[in-house]
């Protein structure tokens, strides 16, 4: 397996793309509320990316995907297609966006709540976020991919939730989905060794119920088999000389 090590110049372009992707989610947050459709949210994101940022929405037409964002509500695990479906009070939704700037991709997703939701849903969102952070904190040269997956799995399952195993993070740069695959489960000290200059996403999907998922007939939407809630967070990460840099960090976010 060949994994690209980014040059200093490439790393700087990744920082710019990552910041732009993060800014899309900063912008869309105030629009997530009961009554809005995911199609409307998608159109707002597209308008912002194309006309304000002057960047390229990577998802549009990617392998036939019809939207700018993936919008995954409640029991939808990932890759939800924007539609006329309107959010209801208490819905939780993941918005996943990728932009291309100067040929480089920035990829990130966050959880949002429409109105007020249950304590159980809030805990799922929080535990999923912290599991991502645990995985990110395992990133440094000399550590291995299995250390990332193990940290995520240990935290999520330690809180009695389950980790989706069918979908994973990925290398990223000029190629959207590149090597290596970043599994969100695994054993410590296994897999590829991390090296300075690698860039990849960490994006765990965590379910309130069982880990089982199924793909709907549209070929994109993935849902929990038991119809339980699912949450996901995602950041793009750079391996630095002594640890990591989060390229898609939100304002006031610290990992």
Task: Describe each PLM feature range.
Residues 1-255:
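Active-site neighborhoods and metal-handling regions in enzymes and metal-associated proteins
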């Amino acid at each position: 397996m060949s994994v690209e090590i980014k040059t200093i110049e490439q790393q700087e372009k990744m920082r710019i793309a990552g910041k732009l992707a993060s800014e899309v989610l900063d912008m869309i947050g105030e629009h997530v509320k009961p009554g809005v459709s995911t199609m409307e949210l998608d159109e707002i994101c597209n308008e912002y990316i194309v006309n304000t940022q002057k960047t390229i929405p990577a998802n549009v037409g990617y392998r036939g995907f019809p939207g700018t964002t993936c919008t995954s509500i409640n029991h939808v695990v990932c890759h939800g297609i924007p539609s006329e479906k309107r959010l209801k009070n208490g819905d939780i939704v993941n918005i996943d966006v990728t932009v291309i700037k100067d040929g480089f991709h920035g990829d990130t997703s966050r959880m949002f709540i429409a109105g007020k939701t249950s304590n159980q849903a809030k805990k799922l969102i929080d535990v999923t976020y912290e599991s991502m952070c645990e995985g990110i904190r395992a990133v440094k040269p000399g550590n291995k991919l299995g250390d990332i997956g193990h940290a995520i799995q240990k935290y999520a399952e330690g809180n009695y939730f389950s980790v989706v195993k069918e979908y994973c993070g990925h290398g990223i740069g000029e190629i959207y989905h590149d090597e290596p695959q970043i599994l969100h489960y695994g054993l410590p000290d296994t897999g590829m060794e991390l090296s300075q200059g690698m860039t990849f996403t960490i994006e765990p999907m965590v379910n309130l119920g069982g880990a089982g998922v199924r793909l709907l007939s549209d070929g994109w939407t993935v849902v929990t088999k038991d119809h339980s809630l699912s949450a996901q967070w995602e950041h793009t990460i750079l391996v630095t000389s002594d640890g990591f840099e989060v390229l898609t960090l939100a304002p006031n976010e610290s990992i």
